[in-house]
Curated annotation (Swiss-Prot):
One of its GO terms (molecular function) is NAD+-protein-arginine ADP-ribosyltransferase activity. It catalyses: L-arginyl-[protein] + NAD(+) = N(omega)-(ADP-D-ribosyl)-L-arginyl-[protein] + nicotinamide + H(+). It comes from the Eukaryota. Testis specific. PANTHER family: ADP-RIBOSYLTRANSFERASE, ECTO-ADP-RIBOSYLTRANSFERASE 3. Belongs to the Arg-specific ADP-ribosyltransferase family. Pfam families: ART. It is a lipid-anchor; GPI-anchor. This is Ecto-ADP-ribosyltransferase 3. It comes from Homo sapiens (Human). Residues 346-356 have a biased composition (Pro residues). Glycans are attached at residues 248, 346. GO terms for cellular component: extracellular exosome; extracellular region; plasma membrane; side of membrane. Residues 325-362 are annotated as: Disordered.
Length: 389
């Protein structure tokens, strides 16, 4: 039986696609400038309270795979959360996102690969993030989970963890720094290089989080490293292996992109360190917790105190409208606000008051005149009465 030209072309294309899928591709280690690296430092509460819960509902409804992964992790988290120490501000959605990513990453599922590739490319522009990134809520909750579980560098960087990859390449020169560009698991057991193409990364992380307590069974030390932690890269001996030493900083091209922040030309260092307070009391179900969480700011002097954000390349984007979703107006950036003053962020847009949300409504504060105005009104009334008499 003769095979037609069309059938031959189809078979060749199918073969090429299969080869591309199963081929182990070399990983380039660099600053991952196309990754979506927002840390939401200036808009954490606004995002968490006002926008992300609705985003999660919409993204789960439109992405069946995400919905399945989330619901499976939700059940695991419910059974696990009473057995581990947690910071006071650590919420269920943080734990669910963490459990979901750990499970999918360990099993190397299609969802893990889909999410990782999306994160690595969604930062090309704000439009790519807004229109093309399907995991905005998942990314937010996972980022916040790692921030809240973070410990001081002195405690986390003493022990080396390892990661292997097929033919990782790094171009030495300049600062010799790199970021992974996606959330990365590393292990305490050093693997043996099976061939010359396998690269072993020895990683000393400051901002990575030990996650073995989140697993169902005891295991070796496993560390989840944030995508934007900056490492100093050096070569180990004469082979392909590399040493990655954290500089105890992250850097980001984005800050509150969902609220209008544009991509900066340079990767801006984030100098905020979160000092969580941990709680553990599984026996008391209705335990009431007071929020004693605090942030210890380690701010460095980068020039004048009132240095403008424009000096760092921060730009403001006009609001972009997505069909079926409300995107808030971009946050204004005052000229006298310094880059380091992230403890007093610029107020966001005020929503239109709804029922019982305005101060004059029955559920709010009464709008009373000031005391001085009351005195003036009484005086005027008395004068008018005296004149009339």
């Amino acid at each position: 039986m003769k095979t037609g030209h069309f059938e031959i072309v189809t078979m060749l294309l199918a073969t090429m696609i299969l080869v591309d899928i199963f081929q182990v591709k070399a990983e380039v280690l660099d600053m991952a400038d196309n990754a979506f690296d927002d840390e939401y430092l200036k808009c954490t509460d606004r995002m968490e309270i006002k926008y992300v819960p609705q985003l999660l509902k919409e993204e789960k409804a439109s992405h069946q795979q995400l919905d399945t992964v989330w619901e499976n992790a939700k059940a695991k988290w419910a059974a696990r959360k009473t057995q581990i120490f947690l910071p006071m501000n650590f919420k269920d959605n943080h734990g669910i996102a963490l459990m979901a990513y750990i499970s999918e990453a360990q099993e190397q599922t299609p969802f893990y690969h889909l999410f990782s590739e999306a994160v690595k490319m969604a930062g090309q522009s704000r439009e790519d993030y807004i229109y093309g990134f399907q995991f905005k809520a998942f990314h937010f909750y996972l980022t916040r989970a790692l921030q809240l579980l973070r410990k001081p560098c002195e405690a986390s960087s003493k022990t080396v963890v390892y990661r292997t990859s097929q033919g990782t390449s790094f171009t030495f020169g300049g600062l010799n720094q790199a970021r992974f560009g996606h959330f990365t698991l590393a292990y305490s057991a050093k693997p043996q290089a099976a061939n010359d193409q396998l690269t072993v990364l020895s990683i000393y992380t400051c901002l990575g989080v030990d996650i073995e307590n989140f697993l169902d069974k005891e295991s070796e030390r496993i560390t989840l490293i944030p995508l934007n932690e900056v490492f100093q890269v050096s070569q180990e001996g004469a082979g392909n292996n590399l040493i990655l030493q954290s500089i105890n900083k992250t850097c980001s091209h984005y800050e509150c992109a969902f609220l209008g922040g544009l991509k900066t030309e340079n990767c801006i260092e984030n100098l905020e360190y979160f000092q969580p307070i941990y709680v553990y009391n599984p026996g008391e179900k209705n335990q009431k917790l007071e929020d004693h969480s605090e942030k210890n700011w380690k701010l460095e002097d980068h020039g004048e105190k009132n240095q403008k954000l424009e000096d760092h390349g921060v730009k403001i984007l006009e609001p972009t409208q997505i069909p079926g979703m409300k995107i808030p107006e971009p946050f204004p950036l005052p000229e006298d606000k310094s880059q380091g003053n992230i403890n007093n962020p610029t107020p966001g847009p005020v929503p239109v008051p709804g029922p019982k949300s305005h101060p004059s409504a029955s559920s709010g504060k009464l709008l009373l005149p000031q005391f001085g105005m009351v005195i003036i009104l009484i005086s005027v009334s008395a004068i008018n009465l005296f004149v009339a008499l």
